[in-house]
């Protein structure tokens, strides 16, 4: 993501949700107070300059960066094709909020992920009444949580689509199993 993307995302989310921008930019108790004070002066100035902007596309034009605009387009297109969306980070949440104001059903295709413990992300997830798929306590860059959650999502999809149901329980005779599965049978029998 680009420099300033979290601040831009905080402005977008603040305007669309009436959540105070300060709650979205504060990363945690260790954030430098002088840095926060300066940031708040700049962000409040941007909010004041665009105080009458409320429509999603206008909010995007006033506060969003290029990367947020691209994500809004990708989210809308992916949801229109019923693709799964992995949402990770404040800029992705801002893009999703904009997309949801344009076409609300996009949130039906979302799995929320988390790469760090930024307090502003807590506020953003609360706006969607969502929690992250996994809370790993990482302090990494946006997207890491989605990358780590992807294998879990793939496994869940496989369970839903590939596991035999009650009508077709699969092979009943060990001889009809592929070689690796036959070798695993004695090990499975030894488990408590």
Please give the residue ranges for each predicted region.
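N-terminal loops that bind phosphate or other acidic moieties
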Residues: 1-192
